[in-house]
Amino acid sequence: MAVALTAHLQMPTMEPPDKEATVTAFETLLQEARSLDLARVDDRFRLGELAEAMRRDHPAGDLFERLAIDLEVDPGQLTEAWYVAMAFPPATRRPGLPWEIYRILRYHPERHELVSLAAHHSWDQARVERELADRFATQLGRAAG
């Protein structure tokens, strides 16, 4: 599977040496991605960060699909890891929170505040969903009032 993702990068070229350094960096990122345990929240965040680094260095339109094939994961799972990692920079992440809480909050404008509250009060997924519903109801009340 790795051949599909990296074959085009290994072809001999007359490119400047910088290209080789980029290939080496890409290979290093790919090797790290292959070693991740996606059952761990930290590793899911890391997968998203690695996907972003690869996307910046090799902006191919089908990069995530090819990477998903190489890693034998669903492309949606890879895209989700990328989006959640971009929505929650390392300084905003809280130890001990399940991935689902980050996933639920990834689009919310107050996601960093909500993650802090969830961590501080040991909220589970159901409690986070109730908080979101309460905040939405409050906003609707203000708009109607």
Indicate where each model-derived feature is located.
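Amphipathic alpha-helical "recognition" segments
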Residues: 44, 61-138
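N-terminal acidic-hydrophobic amphipathic loop/helix motif that frequently occurs adjacent to catalytic
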Residues: 1-71, 116-119
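Long, compositionally biased
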Residues: 137-145
